[in-house]
Every structure is written in structure tokens, then in C-alpha cells.
């Protein structure tokens, strides 16, 4: 008689932003540690977990469709994530969902899984769980989540109502996780949160401990400590607080990547006030100039919203003028979309869709020209590139100026003698508005 027991199998669908990806990885790690197998096909799974996004209406729709697909293909579905905070909305469309939890409800998700698909009593697979946790990103880069929630109340955003106020992770825990990632082969750490520059504010920047040494709970201290790991460290979602100035010298010294992702959202003081965002555009331009003087290699990424309620042609022109003067390297632009529960929904003078579309096109046309000019300046120079993919035609990687998924790529045509995670020196030979082409030096 066989003593082989059935290993319970879980399907997993992860939607949304990198912060959601981190939540998914944490749940997956716990499941694998307990002896569950994670499978890629609905019909192989005993149950499916859908980690949802609910930030904008299109994301809500995508999440609802993913839940529906999981129900049709499998039938046993647990929902978690941001949209899970709106249980009634999910139940109205999908009443057969077994359980619904909100964001970062790891323990609740696991309890529900245990109820419907009991965990195996004996787990001989524990040692198979990678030391750096189960990752949904390639092995050579990883997201490092340093906090949850946000203290800001931007009128276009509902994240605080979904994820709550800022809660910083203990700096010792963050640094220990980073060390485990590096020990497991990670070459690039991407620091993420809802508001990276606010790290430690909620605990009054108290002193924590790592390896027996005192470390202040702050973004600057975190960067100084991460720089000792000898890998690329990239900062995302940095709110433009004054102390952001203090990380620029670390970038100039090569301690962390000269890359700053600062969502500025607009340039009209009036619109920024309606958004409840900081509104001194002249001050921001002066800071950008100062940052570039300290760190000439600095790459600046930002995101903007066009068609926000009340935006006039004059407001929009201020945004275009800001782009021309700031000459940002990487820019994302979104047409304003109402989000259920957001304060901006109640603002007067909603902008017609055709006007949003026209302004978005003008914005993108201008920024593409600026991006192309910025990248053209790199032609003839040598840069470091981290390799992401290799096939028979060559390799694709990213420079220090490129975050995965959202920025450009560096194409190394014909270069096959490398592997993902390698960092190589490349001479840039060509550029367009987004990407670079070059050869290994």
C-alpha cells in the first residue's frame, strides 16, 4: 500500500502594482513552507487565490474579470488585495466567491486556505523553499517593501482607505530580508512602498538594530545600510520631502543607483492644491537643478495626471512648460479616471474625455521628444547594463536608468555569452525615445 499523500495544490493570480507583487510573494512563501504546491493551471488546483487591484476603475474591472475566470475554470476562489476592501462590490458580481479579505491580510488568507484545503500534516518539502522566499520576479532582482499605507490624502487616490495610514517595517527586519535576498543571488533591490521617503515617520525615526548595531529608521539610513550589500539599490515612489536632498550625495558617491522615482502629478499650483499635493513648482525646478549639479548621472522618473477636474488649457500649458524646463528622463502620464471613493469625484468642472485624450497626446508627443534627446546624449558612451533575458538573437538588459517593467531596455544584438543577472559594460551605439542599442565592451 502506497504511503504517498496528496500534496494540496493552490493556483495563484497576482494583479496590480509591485507592492501587490510583494504581498503575493509573501503569501506564496507561507503556502510553500506549509507544504502546498503552487500550480500554474486552474484545473490542477484545489483552490485559487486572486490578489486584486482596486486603484482605478480599469483595474477594478480587470480584477473582477480575473475572479470570474477563476470561478469558471476552478470554482473554489478566495479573493484578497485592494479590491477585497470592497466586499459588497465583489459579492454583487461574484456571489460564489468563498472568502474575501482586504490588502495585507496574509494570516486571514492562510486561515481560509487551511479551512477549505487543509495543509498536509507531514511536510517533507520544507527544505525546497528558497531561502530568499518564493519570488514572482526573475531571480536577479527583487522588490523590498519597507512600509505599508500612506499618511497623505491626495484627492485622486483611495490607497489610504484601502491600506490605512503609514506603518513602517522595523529597519532590522528590512535589512535582514535584503541580506537574505543578496545571499540568494539577487543583484538589484527595488525599494518600494506607498511613500518611501516617509519611512520611519510613524515611529518618529526610532533607532532599530541590525547585526547588533543601532540604525535609525529613516530612508537615508536605510540607503546607507543597503549600499553595504554591494548590489544595485533603486528607490521608487519617493514623495518630494526636503530630506530627499540627503540621498542625492549617496547617489553621487555610487552607494545607490542615481535613479529617483518622484510622482509629481502636475505643475499647476491650482491643480496641485485641488489634488492636495505640494505646489511649489519653482522650488521643485530649483531642486532638480541642484540634484543634477550634485549628481550629473541622475535619472529622474515621474508620473503626471492630465484632465484632472478643473484643469484648464492654462493649467495644462503650465504642465507642458514644466516638462520643457525639467527635461525629465522617464515619464508616465495618465488620463484622469474617477475612482470610487476618491475626493476628486466631487470636484466641479470635470474635463470631457475628448479633451483628456487630446491633452494626453500633446503631453506624450512633447515628452517623447525630450526622452529621445536625453537618450541620444548617451550614444558613444559606456554604461553598465544588468542582463534580464538572453536568447539566440542576443541579450536584453537595463541600464542604471531603467527600472524593470516601466522604463526602457538596452538591446545587445548578437550577445549570447551572458546570463540573466550579469552586469556588463556596454558601449551605446544607437537610441530612440525609449531604448538603447549597444555592444559589450
From Swiss-Prot:
GO terms for biological process: tRNA modification. Binds 2 [4Fe-4S] clusters. One cluster is coordinated with 3 cysteines and an exchangeable S-adenosyl-L-methionine. [4Fe-4S] cluster 2 binds at residues 150, 154, 157. [4Fe-4S] cluster 1 binds at residues 17, 53, 82. It catalyses: L-aspartate(89)-[ribosomal protein uS12]-hydrogen + (sulfur carrier)-SH + AH2 + 2 S-adenosyl-L-methionine = 3-methylsulfanyl-L-aspartate(89)-[ribosomal protein uS12]-hydrogen + (sulfur carrier)-H + 5'-deoxyadenosine + L-methionine + A + S-adenosyl-L-homocysteine + 2 H(+). Belongs to the methylthiotransferase family. RimO subfamily. This is Ribosomal protein uS12 methylthiotransferase RimO. It comes from Salmonella paratyphi B (strain ATCC BAA-1250 / SPB7). The lineage of its organism: Bacteria, Pseudomonadati, Pseudomonadota, Gammaproteobacteria, Enterobacterales.
Amino acid at each position: 500500500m502506497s504511503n504517498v499523500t496528496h500534496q494540496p495544490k493552490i493556483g495563484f493570480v497576482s494583479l496590480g502594482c509591485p507592492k501587490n507583487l510583494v504581498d503575493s510573494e509573501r503569501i506564496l512563501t507561507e503556502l510553500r513552507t506549509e507544504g502546498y504546491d503552487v500550480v500554474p493551471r486552474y484545473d490542477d488546483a484545489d483552490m485559487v487565490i486572486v490578489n486584486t487591484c482596486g486603484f482605478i476603475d480599469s483595474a477594478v474591472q480587470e480584477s473582477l474579470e480575473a475572479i470570474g475566470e477563476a470561478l469558471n475554470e476552478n470554482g473554489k476562489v478566495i479573493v484578497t488585495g485592494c479590491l477585497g476592501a470592497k466586499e459588497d462590490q465583489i459579492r454583487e458580481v461574484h456571489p460564489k466567491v468563498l472568502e474575501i479579505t482586504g490588502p495585507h491580510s496574509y494570516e486571514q488568507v492562510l486561515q481560509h486556505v487551511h479551512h477549505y484545503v487543509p495543509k498536509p500534516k507531514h511536510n517533507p518539502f520544507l527544505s525546497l523553499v528558497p531561502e530568499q522566499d518564493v519570488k514572482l520576479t526573475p531571480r536577479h532582482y527583487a522588490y523590498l517593501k519597507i512600509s505599508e499605507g500612506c499618511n497623505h490624502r491626495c484627492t485622486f487616490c483611495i490607497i489610504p482607505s484601502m491600506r490605512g495610514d503609514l506603518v513602517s517595517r522595523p529597519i532590522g527586519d528590512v535589512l535582514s530580508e535584503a541580506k537574505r535576498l543578496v545571499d540568494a543571488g539577487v543583484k538589484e533591490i527595488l525599494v518600494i512602498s506607498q511613500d518611501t521617503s516617509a519611512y520611519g515617520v510613524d515611529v518618529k525615526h526610532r533607532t532599530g538594530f541590525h547585526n547588533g548595531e543601532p540604525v535609525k529608521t529613516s530612508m537615508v539610513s536605510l540607503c546607507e545600510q543597503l549600499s553595504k550589500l554591494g548590489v544595485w539599490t533603486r528607490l521608487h515612489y519617493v514623495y518630494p520631502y526636503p530630506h530627499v536632498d540627503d540621498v542625492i550625495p549617496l547617489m553621487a558617491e555610487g552607494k545607490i543607483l542615481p535613479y529617483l522615482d518622484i510622482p509629481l502629478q502636475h505643475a499647476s499650483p491650482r491643480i496641485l492644491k485641488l489634488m492636495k499635493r505640494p505646489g511649489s513648482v519653482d522650488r521643485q525646478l530649483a531642486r532638480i537643478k541642484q540634484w543634477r549639479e550634485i549628481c550629473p548621472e541622475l535619472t529622474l522618473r515621474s508620473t503626471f495626471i492630465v484632465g484632472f477636474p478643473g484643469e484648464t488649457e492654462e493649467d495644462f500649458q503650465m504642465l507642458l512648460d514644466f516638462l520643457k524646463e525639467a527635461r525629465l528622463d522617464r515619464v508616465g502620464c495618465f488620463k484622469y479616471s474617477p475612482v470610487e471613493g476618491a475626493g476628486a469625484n466631487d470636484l466641479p468642472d470635470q474635463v470631457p474625455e475628448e479633451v483628456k485624450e487630446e491633452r494626453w497626446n500633446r503631453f506624450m508627443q512633447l515628452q517623447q521628444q525630450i526622452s529621445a534627446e536625453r537618450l541620444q546624449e548617451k550614444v558613444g558612451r559606456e554604461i553598465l547594463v544588468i542582463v534580464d533575458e538572453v536568447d539566440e538573437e542576443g541579450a536584453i538588459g537595463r541600464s542604471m536608468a531603467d527600472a524593470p517593467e516601466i522604463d526602457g531596455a538596452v538591446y545587445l544584438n548578437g550577445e549570447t555569452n551572458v546570463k540573466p543577472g550579469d552586469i556588463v559594460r556596454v558601449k551605446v551605439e544607437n537610441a530612440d525615445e525609449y531604448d538603447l542599442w549597444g555592444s559589450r565592451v
